[in-house]
Curated annotation (Swiss-Prot):
It holds the Pfam family LYTB. [4Fe-4S] cluster binds at residues 12, 103, 199. It comes from Symbiobacterium thermophilum (strain DSM 24528 / JCM 14929 / IAM 14863 / T). Pathway: Isoprenoid biosynthesis; dimethylallyl diphosphate biosynthesis; dimethylallyl diphosphate from (2E)-4-hydroxy-3-methylbutenyl diphosphate: step 1/1; Isoprenoid biosynthesis; isopentenyl diphosphate biosynthesis via DXP pathway; isopentenyl diphosphate from 1-deoxy-D-xylulose 5-phosphate: step 6/6. InterPro entries: LytB/IspH. Binds 1 [4Fe-4S] cluster per subunit. GO terms for biological process: dimethylallyl diphosphate biosynthetic process; isopentenyl diphosphate biosynthetic process, methylerythritol 4-phosphate pathway; terpenoid biosynthetic process. This is 4-hydroxy-3-methylbut-2-enyl diphosphate reductase. Isopentenyl diphosphate binds at residues 43, 81, 131, 227, 229, 272. Keywords: 4Fe-4S, Iron, Iron-sulfur, Isoprene biosynthesis, Metal-binding, Oxidoreductase. Dimethylallyl diphosphate binds at residues 43, 81, 131, 227, 229, 272.
């Protein structure tokens, strides 16, 4: 099987920084115990399992403020997705030792929102509902940041004539979908200022898939199902490159039926996918003998 290794792929700088920070904290005997992560440090179960092996406890499943109430003492780590100011304030009130692993790109978006709202803007924020990154961003200025996921959500919004408006977004969305939605916002409210915050790593990975996937018969994206950026890579392969594409968490999830009749398979991975997981997928495919397997 010929494998096209799409590059860039895998870890982005924000994920690398977050993982390295947790490792350092876990190995530091001076850091108060127990050590908690408020949500998954990044959306990948393999990374979460590594953190748990280091003695770090992952709290997941609710909004960040609710999760925080489960912690009475010790250390709390904020994930790469960022948290709202209310979460930071509550952590200090509880006397917790705080470690902030927020991606610098997310921090920049929070600062942008705060600055815009301080100047009298209402902010339309394009993001995935239920994802922790929009939760933190909307929490920067509750009541002034309006979360929309699709065009239909715009129908519920109304602003006073002359209201200053800005639109920005979650960093890991499809850049094409985001641009299309921003154009719809601009068409409805022409005074809207546009601030596209798709991070460079997301852009580069999506553009690489759009460029290289057409050379393949099949695209496999290695990533966690909760990883928004991984899911967007599948979307790009299917919608822009018009290729069959599948998301797998590990090599064990590859269905041989996908490979039947295929000669070239392109492989990429999400920004939170460990390198060794992707390497195992590539090695499996390179050794896969289509003729033998199809007999």
């Amino acid at each position: 099987m010929e494998v096209i290794k799409i590059t860039p792929r895998g870890y982005c700088h924000g994920v690398v920084g977050a993982i390295q920070l947790v490792r350092r904290v876990a190995r530091d005997p001076n850091v108060p115990r127990p050590i908690y992560v408020l949500g998954q440090i990044v959306h990948n179960r393999h990374v979460v399992e590594e953190m748990e092996a280091l003695g770090v406890i992952t709290l997941d499943g609710e909004d960040r403020l609710s999760l925080l109430e489960k912690i009475d003492a010790g250390t709390v780590i904020f994930t790469a997705h960022g948290v709202s100011p209310a979460v930071k304030i509550r952590a200090r009130e509880k006397g917790l030792y705080v470690v902030d692993a927020t991606c610098p790109d997310v921090t920049r978006t929070h600062e942008l929102i705060a600055e815009l709202v301080s100047r009298g803007y209402e902010v339309i924020y394009i993001g995935k509902k239920g994802h922790p990154e929009p939760e933190g961003a909307v929490g920067v200025a509750p009541g002034h940041v309006h979360l929309v996921e699709r065009a239909e959500d715009l129908e519920a919004l109304s602003f006073a004539p002359g209201q200053k408006l800005a639109v920005t977004n979650q960093t890991t969305l499809s850049q094409w979908d985001t641009q299309a939605l921003m154009e719809q916002v601009k068409a409805r409210w022409p005074q809207t200022e546009i601030y596209n915050e798709i991070c460079l790593a997301t852009q580069q990975r999506q553009e690489a898939v759009a460029r290289m996937a057409p050379e393949a018969d099949l695209v496999i994206v290695v990533g966690d199902r909760r990883s928004n950026n991984s899911n967007r890579l599948v979307q790009v392969a299917q919608e822009l490159a018009a290729r069959e594409a599948h998301l797998v968490d590990s090599v064990e999830e590859i269905d041989p039926a996908w490979l039947k009749g295929k000669r070239k398979v392109a492989v990429t991975s999400g920004a939170s996918t460990p390198t060794h997981i992707t390497r195992a997928v590539i090695e499996f495919l390179e050794k896969y003998n289509v003729e033998v397997e199809e007999r």
